[in-house]
């Protein structure tokens, strides 16, 4: 199984509602027509998340959303890319966006909190309030799931293990957990490209940036 990530910036400040409608109601559902995609979810770096983050860098600072797809294996990547081309050709793509970081990453670690009934491999499919993500150095996933608000964690790495992405799935209060996890990952955060919480994207609730968006 591979994780395909996209850290996405919406380049038009007035375009967040349109972007969310496109992604949640058109683009994301279409991905599940591809055999070998078992999971797809997107989270938002809301203003409240930005205020709670532990680290950022020039490359990742512009992003607003993180999407994660789980692919059966690398053979799923060609049809995944081909679908993107077909949607572009059919004018079913959102132009005012750019990926500041994207691509496939190998799964190198999985953890589940002892209190949850599911296996570590099932954690992403379990409902959560959001995630806490560390991009850059590897962090010990066990230290994350030891926190009572974390159901589990998955860790991904690029092919040369130069960049790790650790995703902790938070089923407790997100920002309380984020405060505690920021202390847990403090040493790694000094070298991290980005570290912080991301909120769950709920259907038809896309107003996080409304007060920041010109009308």
Predicted regions located by residue number:
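Macromolecular interaction modules
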Residues: 1-215
């Amino acid at each position: 199984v591979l994780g395909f990530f996209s850290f996405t910036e919406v380049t038009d400040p007035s375009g967040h509602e349109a972007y969310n409608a496109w992604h949640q109601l058109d683009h994301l559902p279409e991905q599940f027509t591809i055999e070998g995609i078992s999971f797809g979810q997107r989270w938002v770096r809301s203003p409240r998340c930005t205020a709670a983050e532990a680290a950022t860098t020039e490359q990742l600072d512009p992003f607003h959303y993180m999407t994660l797809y789980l692919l059966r294996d690398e053979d799923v990547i060609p049809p995944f890319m081909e679908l993107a081309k077909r949607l572009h050709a059919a004018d079913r793509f959102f132009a005012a966006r750019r990926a500041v970081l994207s691509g496939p990453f190998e799964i190198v670690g999985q953890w589940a909190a002892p209190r949850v009934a599911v296996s570590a491999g099932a954690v992403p499919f379990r409902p959560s309030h959001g995630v806490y993500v560390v991009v850059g150095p590897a962090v010990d996933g066990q230290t994350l799931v030891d926190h009572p608000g974390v159901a589990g964690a998955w860790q991904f790495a690029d092919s040369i293990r130069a960049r790790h992405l650790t995703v902790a799935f938070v089923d407790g209060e997100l920002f309380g957990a984020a405060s505690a996890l920021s202390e847990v990952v403090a040493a790694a955060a000094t070298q991290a490209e980005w570290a912080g919480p991301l909120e769950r994207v709920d259907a038809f609730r896309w107003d996080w940036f409304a007060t920041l968006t010109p009308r």
